[in-house]
Amino acid sequence: KELDFWETIDKPLILSEYGADTVAGIHGFTPEMFTEEFQVEYYRTINGCLDERRFVVGEWPWNFADFSTQQGPMRVGSCNRKGLFTRERTPKLAAHYFRDRWSKKEPNDR
């Protein structure tokens, strides 16, 4: 519902810098935090909300690739792991999810 306010402004919206920490190679039968499945499910949920709103014209997840940063209580080690790729540029499941999502032919077929 928070997105609905932005429709009243009558301007196109691009959502950026949204993501979920994921440790590459960690998998689960259910999408538990830090698994690659959780990251994909997180994006599916957020993007489902975006897809329902015609004024949303774009998206850019945070981040392209994992990167070093300071430690924090909600972070595994000293690395921001919200990347679609690892620091070595190995794709995570989310990279494949976005490849499929962004490969659709129609501009409004997100």
What spans do the regions from the language model cover?
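Substrate-binding clefts and catalytic carboxylate motifs of secreted carbohydrate-active enzymes
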Residues: 1-110
